[in-house]
């Protein structure tokens, strides 16, 4: 079962809470209700959806919900675990040969690791392995970019549709200039679509696109670590060398902690 990335919903709730707090603290509950206007919301959401339909094929749009859900899930692979796996595999490969690693495949969940090890067992040349695995990385990156682009475009479109809604409201307001008492309320309603467009863009669409970009970056980084581990296995590098080489990819803070622990053990 995938864990929930709590920072995403918490961040959205914090943003909404600050807006609600600012409105209520300035004018009370009645002022807050003035910020709720269903037609304005429909103009922005409907307009964004319409432009997304024009911009992307149906097959891609169907996946928008699934792609967006990734921003609310936490499934980051631990780099330290990957390093530990390849240290263990390199020890076994040096003792028993590369063919012995076939028995370890059932215990490995990551399909990318499995694919790399199978290529190594089959005796594929290191450069060919690197080329094949990097081609897969490029495919993953392109697929993620396509999914993320829907949220990036929605973030661009939302403020524009907010402005369109405001223009519609202003036209309607100007047509009722003969009733000055309604100008203030009509102007407020006209501006609400701009408010909704800016809010959706800066609190939902763009942040989700940024979160997805960060997750993609981490996934590609882990796959690069795996490639180096597979090449090390094929080259018959000893476990200490593999560990030292792959540790370079670990976060700086964790590397420093490991170095301190090693110094303590040596002392």
Swiss-Prot record:
Name the source's superkingdom.
Bacteria
PROSITE patterns associated with the record: MOTA (PS01307)
Provide Cytoplasmic-side residue ranges.
209-267
Q: Which GO terms describe its cellular component?
A: plasma membrane
List the GO biological process terms.
Answer: bacterial-type flagellum-dependent swarming motility; chemotaxis
Record-linked InterPro entries: Flag_MotA_CS, MotA-like, MotA_ExbB_proton_chnl
Localisation per UniProt entry: Cell membrane
Q: How does it sit in the membrane?
A: Multi-pass membrane protein
Bilayer-spanning residue ranges = 4-24, 32-52, 154-174, 188-208
Give a yes or no for keyword Flavoprotein in this entry.
no
Q: Which UniProt keywords apply?
A: Cell membrane, Membrane, Transmembrane, Transmembrane helix, Transport
Q: What is its main location?
A: membrane
The family assignment reads: Belongs to the MotA family.
What biological function has been recorded for the protein in this entry? May be involved in some transport function.
Protein name according to UniProt: Uncharacterized 29.3 kDa protein in ccpA 3'region
State the taxonomy lineage. Answer: Bacteria, Bacillati, Bacillota, Bacilli, Bacillales
